Swiss-Prot record:
Protein name: 1-deoxy-D-xylulose-5-phosphate synthase
Cofactor annotation comment: Binds 1 Mg(2+) ion per subunit. Binds 1 thiamine pyrophosphate per subunit.
Gene responsible for this protein: dxs
General function of this protein: Catalyzes the acyloin condensation reaction between C atoms 2 and 3 of pyruvate and glyceraldehyde 3-phosphate to yield 1-deoxy-D-xylulose-5-phosphate (DXP).
The organism of origin for this protein: Azorhizobium caulinodans (strain ATCC 43989 / DSM 5975 / JCM 20966 / LMG 6465 / NBRC 14845 / NCIMB 13405 / ORS 571)
Residues that hold Mg(2+) according to the record: D150, N179
PROSITE patterns: TRANSKETOLASE_1
Annotated pathway: Metabolic intermediate biosynthesis; 1-deoxy-D-xylulose 5-phosphate biosynthesis; 1-deoxy-D-xylulose 5-phosphate from D-glyceraldehyde 3-phosphate and pyruvate: step 1/1
Length: 641
């Protein structure tokens, strides 16, 4: 492997060293920073394209602003790797997303240079405004800078924050990182000149003087002058939308040209006016040809060869659950023209890119707008369509009020395909699908399913298509299936009914979802000790199979309920039923194994499951504490009636 020399970057311990560098050295620093980012991510995998697109911007921000005293907030955090390298974390950059290593996102507990944690989209302006107001209340003078991408600007939260900031006239700097040129491209030297001019003190001072003088003029003259300035600046800069929200707009400027960036950032740093938006245009994957040529493939990457760009992907033993979902939904849609699909800016992540290729008129990408996605689906359901709202579990949280108010309360048959349920590995706690079971099983009238394998997922999709009695959800994990044979066509499952997959006498395991394989492993281990175990596949978290659970409780000495979800989910439903029916009064030993009441950091999925006690070893240990081999015969003899 070729090692790129980085003599200037080697002198940078933290951002204070970046500020001490002369401006003529910053281009070299950016080049070396880009090379180091590529080298590090080739080893660890992670988000590459976004970080390469903000290298010059990152250098410029840390050179101009006094971080960490000045608060620099990165929206989402996909682009934060260069920032981490410049802020004292270069020595650990090759531990990104590894167990015990650096987070793939900004994180308050990791560095004082990360004033606000991120991973979900469109939060930076709200957080920045809160910090700006706190500064003003405290009589401080620090700058607050929020860097947000144009994609994140599709979320309503960003505009809610901008509307609030404009109304408060708080001194806040928003950097709009436009890396899709979806708003407006820069127009070369004239664009840079205008941006520098209108962000400068002279123009701003004259503007303030003009406002004061206009205050003494008749209202129609004052309003006319304001509209004339707005028109002139909007004509040249395209920032009328942001001006209407109360922001002073500067740009667009070339985000890869330090000669353009530095003077503008200095001007806005020194401005004492209200909120300012600087529109910076960048290119995803800048400086790395494979990423420039295919931005979507290099947004998130596994380990790759730096020279060729080839990503090292392990051969799959089975299709991913996401692909099974997509292919099955396509089959169902061929039979039912009322089936439609909705995604919130995650078509490839949810598999709906495949559905969209087959049914472009029945596929809807609503942008980063989960609240809207859910209620949009509710509207479709109200008109007799069968909408599948495909969301990651972690992003379902963003639309929860709509799930309750617009779907559940009205009993509308929206189908929720909940991907990335449970632990997700390298993306860590911010993306873990821990809470969907607790969120949904508490809602009256909701049906919630979880497949043990890809065959069951196929059946659950068919079940959801045919379920018009109310809202229904099915959750499935990240990654590959277990390799079972998939049916050619899904069959509708009886609602609220599980199945017994192994018969025993002493201890019963009731598994929801893909922990079933681990429970079967544990049952086999216990068998070698003379302990007979029943293993049941719950299939439904709501409604629970009351008949099956009562049978397990009455015919076994111990019952272990297993789910890859937080406290308050399926296990809580089972315990409530056992309590209501008095099924624990005769001495039944019950344990509900869930994710622990904490946040599990990024690591391999296997390590995360072990930490949670939900791998086969953890389940086995808990089971042995309930039924020892010597107790087996006595337990069978005292079965409860």
């Amino acid at each position: 492997m070729t090692v790129t020399k980085t003599p200037l970057l080697d002198t940078v311990r933290d951002a204070s060293d970046v500020r001490r560098l002369p401006e003529e050295k910053l281009s070299q620093l950016a080049d070396e920073l880009r090379a180091e980012t590529i080298s590090a991510v080739s080893v660890t995998g992670g988000h590459l394209g976004a970080g390469l697109g903000v290298v010059e911007l990152t250098v410029a921000l840390h050179h101009v602003f006094n971080t960490p005293h000045d608060r620099l907030i990165w929206d989402v955090g996909h682009q934060c790797y260069p920032h981490k390298i410049l802020t004292g974390r270069r020595d650990r950059i090759r531990t990104l997303r590894q167990g015990g290593g650096l987070s793939g996102f900004t994180r308050r507990s990791e560095s004082e240079y990360d004033p606000f944690g991120a991973a979900h989209s469109s939060t930076s302006i709200s957080a920045g405004l809160g910090m700006a107001v706190a500064r003003d209340l405290s009589g401080g003078d620090r700058n607050v800078i929020a860097v947000i991408g144009d994609g994140a600007m599709s979320a309503g939260m960003a505009y809610e924050a901008m509307n609030n900031a404009g109304a408060m006239d708080s001194r806040l700097i928003v950097i709009l990182n436009d890396n899709d040129m979806s708003i407006a491209p820069p127009t070369g030297a004239m664009s840079a000149y205008l941006a520098r001019l209108i962000s400068g003190r002279t123009y701003l001072s004259l503007r303030e003087i003009g406002k004061q003088l206009a205050g003494h003029l008749p209202k129609f003259v004052k309003d006319g002058a304001a509209k004339a300035e707005e028109f002139a600046r909007g004509f040249w800069t395209g920032g009328t939308l942001f001006e209407e929200m109360g922001f002073y707009y500067v740009g667009p400027i070339d985000g890869h040209n330090l000669e353009h960036l530095l003077p503008v950032l200095k001007n806005v740093r020194d401005a004492k006016t209200g909120p300012i938006l600087v529109h910076v245009v960048t290119q995803k994957g800048k400086g790395y040809p494979p990423a420039e040529a295919s931005a979507d493939k290099y947004h998130g990457v596994v380990k790759f060869d730096v020279v060729t760009g080839a990503q090292v992907k392990a051969k799959s033993n089975a299709p991913s659950y996401t692909r099974v979902f997509a292919e099955t939904l396509i089959d169902e849609a061929r039979r039912d023209d009322k089936v439609v699909a909705i995604t919130a800016a995650m078509p490839s992540g949810t598999g709906l890119d495949l559905f969209g290729q087959a049914f472009p008129q029945r596929t809807f990408d609503v942008g980063i707008a989960e609240q809207h996605a859910v209620t949009f689906a509710a509207g479709l359901a109200a008109e007799g369509y069968r909408p599948f709202c495909a969301l990651y579990s972690t992003f379902l949280q963003r639309g929860y009020d709509q799930v309750v108010h617009d779907v559940a309360l009205q009993g509308l048959p929206v189908r929720f395909a909940i991907d990335r349920a449970g632990l997700v590995g390298a993306d860590g706690a911010t993306h873990a699908g821990a809470f969907d079971l607790a969120m949904l099983t508490c809602l009256p009238g909701f049906t919630v399913m979880a497949p043990a394998d890809e065959a069951e997922l196929t059946h659950m999709i068919a079940t959801a298509v045919g379920h018009d009695a109310g809202p229904i959800a099915f959750r499935f994990p990240r990654g590959e299936g277990v390799g079972v044979e998939r049916p050619e066509k899904g069959e509708r499952l009886p609602i609220g009914k599980g199945r017994v997959v192994r018969e025993g006498q002493d201890i019963a395991f009731l598994s929801l979802g893909t922990r079933l394989a681990a429970c079967l492993d544990v049952a086999e281990r216990l068998s070698s000790l003379g302990i007979s175990a029943t293993v049941a596949d719950a299939r439904f978290a709501k409604p629970i199979d009351r008949e099956l659970i009562a049978h397990l409780a009455r015919t076994h000495a111990a019952l272990v309920v297993v789910e890859e979800g937080s406290v308050g989910g399926f296990g809580s439903q089972v315990l409530q039923f056992l309590s209501d029916e008095g099924l624990m009064d005769g001495g039944l030993k019950v344990r509900a194994l869930t994710l622990p009441d904490t946040y599990i950091d990024h690591d391999t999925p296997a390590a995360q499951l072990a930490e949670a006690g939900l791998d086969a070893d953890g389940i086995y240990k808990r089971a042995l504490a309930l039924v020892q081999p010597a107790e087996r015969r006595g337990a069978v003899a005292t079965k409860r009636a």
